[in-house]
Amino acid sequence: MREVMTTTMARNIFYGGSIFFIVIFLGLTLHSAHYIVNTSTAALPLTDSVARGKRVWEENACINCHTLYGEGAYFAPELGNVMTRWGVIDQPDDAFSTLKNWIEAMPTKVEGRRQMPRFHLTDDQIRDLANFLIWAGKANTQGWPPKDSG
C-alpha cells in the first residue's frame, strides 16, 4: 500500500463512503416509515370525524393547557388516556355525552381550582373531539403516561 493518498484514492473513498451512508439513511428512513404506519399508530382508522376533532383541538388551543402523549402544557390533565379513565373508550355515544357534560360544566367557579374556559362548542364539534380523543387513546403509546391518572 502506498504511503501517499492519491487524488483518485481520495475521490473513491469519498464517493464510496457517501454512497454507503446514503444507503444506510434511506434504509433507516424506510424502516421508520414502515414502523410508524404499521406498528405505532392507533388501532382505529383515521376517519373524517377524527380529523375534524383534531382540528377542534388545534383551533381551540387545547394543548396550551393540556398534554397529549406528554406534549403540551402541564397546567391541566393529560388527555391521551382520558376516555380510558372515564371508562368510555369503546362507547362513542357515552364518550360524547361525558365530554359534553364536562365541557358544559366549565368553569366551575370553585375557589382554588384551575378553571377550564367555556368554549361554546357545538354538539358536532364535541362529538368530533370525543372521537379524536378515543382515537388518541387507542394509539400504542408504549406505556405513556406512566400513571393511569394522566
Show which residues each predicted segment covers.
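Post-cleavage N-terminal segment of exported redox proteins
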Residues: 1-46, 132-150
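Extracytoplasmic electron-transfer domains, predominantly the class I c-type cytochrome c fold
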Residues: 47-48, 55, 69, 73, ...
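Short cysteine clusters
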Residues: 62-65
